[in-house]
Amino acid sequence: MTGFEIFKKKYQVIQILNEINNNLEERLISIAKDKSGKLCVLKEIKYLNNKKKLEEFKKEEKNEEGIQKRIYQRNFNLEFNHLKNFSQMNHTSIIKYIEHIESKDEFGLVDRCIFVTEYYEDGDLSSIKEIEFKDIINLFLKMLINLKEFQNVIIHRDIKPENIFLRKFKNNDGKVELDCYLGDYGSAQTLYTQNKSTLIGTNQYIAPEVIEKKGHTNLIDIYSLGKTLLSLSKRNTGFVYNRIYLKLFEIMTNPFETRPNVNQLIEFMCRHHENLKYTLLVSDFQHRDSIKCLNYLKEKLIGILDNKTNPLKKIHIDMEFQGKTYHCNGVLRSEYLRNEYILENYPINNNNNNNNNNNNNNNNNNNNNNNNNNNNNNNNNNNNNNNNNNNNNNNNNNNNNNEGEVVQVIELVSTDEKHYSVLEGHINLSESPILNSLSFHDFKVIRGTAPIMHFNDINTSTTGEEEEEEKKDNLKRQNENNQIEQEDKGEKHLKETLNNNNNNNNNNNNNNNNNNNNNNNNSNYNSNRKCLLVLVPMKNHSFRLYKDILKNADETTVEIIQLKAIFHSLLASYLVSLTGVDFALQFLIRGDGINVYFEPPQPSDTTTSNNGEIKLTDYGFKFLFPFKHVSTVYSECNSTYFDIFPQSIPVKNPLVKEIQQFFKDESQTKIPFTTIFQRLISIVLREEYQYKKYKELEYYFEAFNSIDHHYQQLKINNENLVKSEYITRLIDSKEIIKVVNHLTFMPVDDYFFYVVPHNEKVYGIEVYKNFQDIDFFGHAINIIRLSLAILNDHSKHFKFIDAHKDINSSIYYFVYELPPSLASNYKSTSEIQINNKNNNNFYNNNNNNNNNNNNNNNNNNNSNDKSDNENKLLFKQLINQHFNNCIEFINNINTFAREKNPINILLYSMHTIITKNEMNVSSLYYSYMLFGKVNQCIIGSFYDIGKWVYGDQFEKKIKSATFLKNLQYLVWYKMSMISNNHHQVYFSLSNLYSILNEDDKDMMILNLESSLKINENNENEESLPQKLFKLDDIEFGDNFKYSKILIGGICYYILNIKEGDIFKEDQFGLEKKILLLELKQLESGKKYLCFRKQSHQTNTLKELKFNCRTINKKINDEIILEPLFVVEDSNVTFHFYEYKSSFENIKSIESYSKDNSTDYNGIVIIRSLLYYIQYYLSNYKNDDDGSDDDNDNDNNRSLKLVLVNMKDNESLIYLDIQYLIYRLYGVDISLTNEWTKINESLINGTPSLITNFIQTNRNKILNDSICLEILSNELMIKFKPIEIEIQREINHVTSVVSVVDVDVSGNSSKKKFVRKAIGSIIDLKIIGKNYGGIDLSNPRSLGTYNLIGDSVFRNISFFENKKLFEKFDTNVNFQKEIEFVKNYSKFLNFDISNRIPREYSILKSIKGMNGVVQIDSWYLENDIIYILMDYFDGQNLLEVSQDLINDFTLFSILNQLSKILFELETVYSIHHRDLKPDNILIKNDLTICLADFGISHFSKELKNDQDLYYSKDGTLGYQSPEIYSSELRGNGDIKNQPYKMDVFGLRCVMKYLMSKFNSSSSKLKELVEKMGFFNYDDRISLKELIECLNKL
């Protein structure tokens, strides 16, 4: 036995991975298992070219010594030797060598070898789809170590993902990380052969110089590694990481002249790891091995860095900005809305800048002044000179001391106006004085419309031809960009400012490089997206708080620094919380130290240690203000931790721990953050005596004492009123303030305040139970505070004190101080004299509780007792008060917007409280409404007051009341429900004044009228009113008499609004209305009747479309009246009709429905529907109709809403087919854009929902001449109802199966059918709402949603609906069916074609087969699905006459049935499963017909579901025994065994007949016994049964 055979016996080959044969060698790679069971990889190689190699050596070498040297070199260069040598190094990441065996030929060359390596079970890099960036960086570092070891030895030549193997492991946090190992050294070569030009490697990873045969150096491995890393970066799972490394990977793929070597790459990675102190915390080096790799590389590089004679040329990724060149240390991108660059100033370029400043101070001063004016518009002319001088000094100082200057550039890009304004608000907050001393404040903000730069625009330092080519490309791009016309003024201004700066630099230096730099700089400003560019200069030696800073510090130093850091965070967080800007807090109080920076002290304030270094305790702290992209800007703070320290820094100080724990406990109660911070400050001051010894904390204690003094005064005044237990004791449920109900879109409970007198003041406490959105609690408090800051009027508005959550229950208390006049009214009487009237929400009149009903009754009685004049006077008084209050409210908003520039301006959203004093004088007060009311309810507030005064008579007494209500709907639908629409609504207080004044010209008082200055002659104005201010999308313009609406770019006066149909049961809790608008065009004065229809609820701007088109009429009669034109988008449709006086009495289908909108079967509705169907069918497109409407993808031009002019001239109905379908069947087809597809099943399908409606009302239709006239049209013939006359019921299942006569030709020619009910669509209303549109043109599709049963697979409604259950005597286990229905949702994912009604599917598939019932058609009536089957004139075997049956006929019956069942099984793959005498029909000529396929199944369906296979369907006494006993089942797999249950059922039928008719045939008895063996394996199959019958 040879050595190789002995060696191979040690391993058992499991799998051959690869086999390679060529002229040079034969390779066999396999997975094997050693004797211990451990997997490994065997690689066996046979070298076939040794003789040729030896000949080459002899030609190239002159002596034997040289030949032997070449032989040794060739043997040493073999793969297993490289692997053996490098894998023994612990620091390398190379596949691990285990052992090998080799043999040599007679020349001394290795001719065969087998070597063994470790097996890596997780595959290679090519197999992973996602990878974290920290794993990519760790891979990079490990490959750099490998390449450093290879540097003077070998070139790998085939680095690629397929040759880097993986091993996954879990770190301490339980997260999966990757270890990588480089393998496959078969292509490796020693540097001895570097001048060779062998083309070896994988195409996409081969360096260009190899392909061009320019020789091999170790730079080709750098290229391959760069390509590998770039391919992996595309699979990165994160979106926040330092993208500067991506640029480095690109540089690694440069041409070899500019490609960095391994030493340069190592130096770059070590340097950039050190520079992390200037960046936000990223996870690039968080892999457990990354720091180890960096430390090793630093040690390897020491000698190279100290080499002064041949210094290492460093890699710099440079960026030019505003005339300076910077080293870019980091690029972080958060999605596409935010880029962040960490820049370090070039020292060489700084000297140039110093010269520029010294020689050209005037130019620089002007430029600096311009920049300051851009960033601060509040500078006045008197201060400009001083500012210029200061700027000069500052700039000169900075330029003299800016070596190593670090600049953080934050680019916030947004394409959305709202997002952009929020970002500007964020900038304004960070510029505010409250954060001046706490954050890096001396930043610059550039506002423009062009992203300043992108990662792909970073210019890397290059040399030679590449640099010249890059300059040419930049100049070319600049020339192209100059030709682009820039429309945006902000962008023009930005470009002019930058050009001025660049031109000055060009004039001073006269340097071509500077010209090119300016061109590059300008080329970055050519985009239409808005952006904010924030430049944050950080002082020299500023650094982030992290572990290494404190590793050598003593305990006292660590304690002082941690206290200063958390005090700094607490002070900043408290100041930010006062502004109500919650989104900033979560980045201040919990950022793992990413935003907290040490700042070096001023030279005069420094204290040095013994070694001359500045003491850490003298460093201050500054926040890098947390600019985040807009997805986080809007969100409130949701952090429950005060954790500003990185996890690597342990917290030991007890005060810091107490602060963190207290914040965690209190923040979970969702009380306002300002309150939490105030209490934390009190905790800090409690320990002040202990920490006074640290002078470094004096500043913070001074600030905290100032804050706490105000807070303690507030606590003394309120005596802890907001504590939940104290509130509970004070509340008296009998003492309440009722709040006037408001116009809102959803039913809510009545609002009220508990009145609490306390400490010489009176408070109102608002209580909320079961807060639905607990995270909104703290955010809501800030909204209230901002609202009250805008109002600033405690005489009319409740003053918010504080809020509290009871930890032990879901109760929230909001405490307000009552206005003084309201409080004095309470204190002056022994009982509450705030006699508010309270009316129920008018949406919910039928669902009120008893208290609400009593309030309504009292209110209505009081109103009836008063005269109309008294009510009128009271209404006038309150409306005047409210108008003046609203004017003041709007003025306050204008003032606040100008002075404060808040992030969000709150709209009107107030509780209305009406009081009456002892002098019978009513007054209005207001409290901010937290829930239940949309912000646009200023219109509805006037309606509320009228509703309070007049009660339910309001809309009858005041004709403008309905208009007010509907105007509020119109505004609300524009604003709250769908913000993305093409139309706009305009109104003003003067408009509301005019509306109410139509009822009474003396309604308003003079001072109000004079203050409004209404323009009565503005009806013909040509332009929109000048905007005074804007709240979201509602425009409050100049005073005008009429409200206005802008539709499709045309402005109309709103003369009147009527309410149309309402989708009351909308699944989102909303009511999608049709509003009837009477409009007057401003320019032409034409009047229109416009139907505004809300269709969808899409808020995505991309789905918004505008389409204004004139309808092409296909029928031109006077029945269906189409609009003149339609303006529509994806959400709203406007149908415009030329206004006529006859339109005053337009009605909807609701006017003709019976029993309070529950019956839509009236003859007028039936006629309208038939007219519409005729109209719909006549409006299909024709290919030759000349239409070029590319926007209309439907095949039908008909509209969903039309006017129907009834022939009797008694009514004009607007018919919305979607609304009618919704009312009839609960299917909201407006939720889908597939209008034609839906209508094909609703209308054009036969049968369909419409045919169901027609068939249900057939008696009314057949007795109405107008309906018959409509149905006589050739398009409508198929909709004519079927005339059915029931002859008799099949007794065993009452009302389910009947014999009927059907008029099939329409001429009273009747044909007999068997009609069977197989399901129902009663549940369609619920199903349609929950699951969307349903195709009803195919009955099989109904089964997925509606038709589930167990015994006969009937509809759910058979078991859930009592009436239907009583109607059909199903003889099934009711409880069992209910349990079956509970699993209803499981069926939604099943294949529709194989589901119920299965009987219909089966009968359709066997149509034409002899011996089975034949289906004719199906139809819908009264929501029941019926099938019609050909009538079989015979008897069933249960009722068959005794004269017909004998032994001969029994053999005939058995023979026919066995063949029918065999054909069903073999040809159609169907099993009947319910064989019994009732289901077998026979004629006098002994012809057999098999019926009732209600529980039949397709074979595939049965054999894929064992539970279904052995289900207990069918009839007891005829079921196979293996259904009930598993012991009797066959031993084989049900998928492969024949189905024998029908054989057993047939045996039971024959047994019944043989017993009933006294059969004496022994052969028949013997055969039937074989059919009836209880054990499945013993029973004969259908095939065997037929063979036995053929032998008889």
UniProtKB/Swiss-Prot annotation:
Residue stretches of biased makeup (Low complexity): 349-402, 499-526, 837-864
Binding annotation for ATP: 2-10, 43, 1348-1356, 1376
Protein name: Probable serine/threonine-protein kinase DDB_G0293958
Enzyme Commission number(s): 2.7.11.1
Transferase is among the record's keywords: yes
PROSITE patterns per the UniProt record, alphabetical: PROTEIN_KINASE_DOM (PS50011), PROTEIN_KINASE_ST (PS00108)
Coiled-coil residue spans: 461-518
GO molecular function: ATP binding; protein serine kinase activity; protein serine/threonine kinase activity
